[in-house]
Amino acid sequence: MQPRRIARELALLGVNQLPATAAKLSEKQLEDLLLAAIRALSEETHETLSTAAAEIQRSDRLLHESDPLLLADSDPKEEGGSRSVTLRLHQAQRHLQRLEITLKEAKVPNPNALRGEVLELIQQVQVALSNAGQALEHLEQRLHSVRHILDEVVQLSQRAVNRVGVALSMPELLYIAQSQEVRAYALQLLTALRTHKEAIDARLQKALVGWQLQRVGRIERDILRLAVVEMEILASSPVKVAINEAVELAKKYGDPEAAAFVNGVLRRVVDSQMETHRGRDPSLPGSGSGG
C-alpha cells in the first residue's frame, strides 16, 4: 500500500472531527485526531467481517429456500415440475398418433362417423396441449423464482468476498498508518484544509452546477476538499493522481453515485483553474500550480 493513499484515508476520517471554530489546532490535537481515525479503521475491520458473515448466512438460507422449488420436479403430478410438463406433452403426442391412425384407416363410405371421431381426437389434442402449456407456465414461474434466488445468492456472496478482501487489507493499512511518513502527510492535509477551508469551499462552489456545497453529502464534501488541498494548495500530487485517489475514496466510503459525482466536480475545478492559469486566483495560495 502506498503511504500517501493511507494518509489520505486517515485525513478523510479525521476531517469530521475538526472543530468548527477557526482556532488553530495544536500538533497534539491533530495527533489525537489521527489516533481516533486509526481506531475507526480498526472498528471498521470488525464491522466489515461481521457484515460479510451475515451475508454468507443469508446466502445459505436462500439456497435452502430454493430446494422445494427444485425438488418439485420429482413429482410428475406436481404443477410446474418439468416431469409434469413432459407427461402432458407425451399425452398430447399419443392423441396425435391416434388421430393419424384414424385418418389412415378411415372408411370413406361412413364420413359422418369419421368426422365425429376426428373432431373428438382433435379436441383431446387441444386439451392436452393446453394442459401442457399451463404446466410450462408453472415451470417457468418456478424457474424464475429459483433464478431470482440464485442471482441474490451470487450478489450476496460477491459482496461478502469483497468485504473479506477489504478486511484482510486492514491489518497492513493499520500497520502502515503508524509510520511517520503517513502521519506527517495526513497532518499536512488536515492543517492545510483547516487553514484554507473557506477558500477551498469557494473554489468548489464555483465548480458545482445546480448544487450548494453544504447540501452535498459530508463524505463527498470532505473528499472534494482534500483533493483541492492536494491539487492547488499543497500542489503535492499531480492533478490526475489527486482526482483518481479522490474517486477511489468515494467508491469506498460514498454511495454508488459518489465516485462519478466527485470526478465530475474535480474535473470542473481543474477546467476553471486552466481558464485562469494566466493569472493567479487570490483566494488560493497555490492556485495555478500543481498540474
UniProtKB/Swiss-Prot annotation:
CC terms in the record's Gene Ontology section: cytosol
Highest taxon in the source lineage: Bacteria
One annotated GO molecular function: RNA binding
UniProt keyword annotations, A-Z: RNA-binding, Transcription, Transcription antitermination, Transcription regulation
Transmembrane segments: none
An example Gene Ontology biological process: DNA-templated transcription termination
InterPro entries: NusB-like_sf, NusB_fam, NusB_RsmB_TIM44
Keyword check for Metal-binding: no
UniProt keyword RNA-binding present: yes
NCBIfam families, per database record: nusB
Family recorded in the similarity comment: Belongs to the NusB family.
Protein role: Involved in transcription antitermination. Required for transcription of ribosomal RNA (rRNA) genes. Binds specifically to the boxA antiterminator sequence of the ribosomal RNA (rrn) operons.
Protein name, per record: Transcription antitermination protein NusB
Gene name of the record: nusB
